[in-house]
Design a protein with these regions (language model features):
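Short, solvent-exposed beta-strand edge segments and adjacent coil->beta transition regions
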Residues: 24-26, 159, 296-301
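Accessory C-terminal segments flanking Radical SAM cores
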Residues: 184, 226-328
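Hydrophobic/aromatic residues in well-formed alpha-helices
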Residues: 57, 211, 284-287
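A short, aliphatic-rich alpha-helical micro-motif
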Residues: 115-116
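Conserved alpha-helical substructure of the radical SAM core
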Residues: 2-111, 325-328
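A short local structural element in Rossmann-fold oxidoreductases
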Residues: 40-43, 132-133, 269
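Residue-level marker for beta-strand->alpha-helix junctions and adjacent short loops that shape enzyme
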Residues: 49, 79, 106-108, 128, ...
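Radical SAM enzyme [4Fe-4S]-AdoMet core and its adjacent flexible, acidic
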Residues: 95-98, 119-120, 124-126, 130-255, ...
Length: 328
């Protein structure tokens, strides 16, 4: 994120906090539930629902921008399955919105011309080939590496996200070495019982001792590896896994989730709850006057954790976000 954009977002964040205003500054938007993989811990493809048309998406983007949205993360499913993704990305960019897209990498080579306007392409990277493919599907490791190289060659900034399970908890050193080799900022989070996870998610949990030891090592590694995205605050929070604690949550205050059918939610942990709001049935502005808060006992989503700490005006996580612009 460029300095001026950081300054604008920081100002809006501070305004929202000091004056207790609800601003949809950050929006995570599932454009589709369709996916061309079936990861072991995800059941999103089983969530059948309609999708907004490109014209409907444009209308929502117009309103979001007027209300203060400056960062949109397009996700799914696999958003590159939408044939109109280039129109959606380019429309958001013309509004001055910072656009991130989450992908499994399979379609990046085919759709590279359609995503050149992205600010960030985030890819899943779970470890050595045999482990990554075990968690996400045969051939997925090669797809991620190819997608990363093609995106970088086209001057698209790439991030990785790693989901820690019992299969890769002992292989994080491999990931540390690879992200330094590739120079890819990477976030880490535990596999967790979120609302669209597979029913046997517990079988993928790492042992508590193994996970906590891995986080301890990650804290040490971060001192010499600038490509670990997690702030020290979030790593210390994660070191208590699986015991979670409530933290001040930004969801429904400065961040919102839009589901593939246009439903408006505080975050993706509330996807099984109907708040009765939909982009197609009214104005997003009306939602801001309502109390649309997520109620949970804690959070293991790294993006949410980092934004929670930033909203709480914790200096280290804020500086950790800003430094990404200067990471080579």
């Amino acid at each position: 994120m460029k300095f001026i954009k950081n300054l604008e977002i920081g100002g809006l964040l501070l305004y929202a906090k000091l004056f207790r205003k609800r601003i949809p500054l950050f929006v995570s938007w599932s454009l589709t539930n369709r996916c061309n993989l079936h990861c072991r811990y995800c059941e999103i493809p089983a969530l059948k629902s309609r999708e907004l048309t490109a014209e409907q998406v444009f209308k929502v983007i117009d309103e979001l921008h007027k209300l203060g949205t400056r960062v949109v993360s397009f996700t799914g499913g696999e958003p590159l399955l939408r044939k109109d993704i280039v129109k959606i990305i380019d429309y958001a960019k013309r509004k001055g919105i910072y656009v991130k897209l989450n992908s499994n990498g399979i379609l990046v080579k085919k759709r590279i011309e359609d995503i050149k306007n992205l600010d960030v392409l985030q890819l899943s990277f779970d470890g050595p080939k045999e482990i990554h493919d075990k968690q996400r599907g045969k051939g997925s490791y090669d797809s991620v590496i190819e997608a990363m190289k093609i995106a970088k060659a086209n001057r698209i900034k790439v991030y990785f996200n790693t989901t820690i399970t019992r299969f890769n908890v002992d292989n994080l050193d491999y990931i540390f070495s690879k992200i330094k080799e590739f120079k890819i900022p990477t976030s880490f989070q535990p596999v967790t019982n979120i609302l669209f996870c597979t029913k046997n998610i517990g079988s993928l949990y790492p042992k508590k001792g193994d996970f906590r030891e891995a986080i301890k090592n990650m804290i040490k590694e971060k001192r010499k590896n600038p490509y670990i995205l997690n702030s020290y605050n979030s790593l210390r929070y994660m070191s208590n896994w699986p015991l979670s604690s409530r933290i001040n949550c930004f969801a429904g205050k400065v961040a919102y989730r839009i589901s593939s059918d246009g439903g408006i939610l505080p975050c993706n942990r509330t996807m099984d709850k109907s708040f009765g709001y939909n982009c197609l049935k009214g104005n997003f502005k009306d939602v801001l006057s309502k109390k649309l808060d997520a109620v949970c006992n804690g959070c293991w989503c790294i993006t949410a954790l980092e934004l929670n700490y930033a909203f709480a005006l914790r200096l280290e996580p804020i500086l950790n976000i800003i430094r990404l612009d200067y990471l080579k």
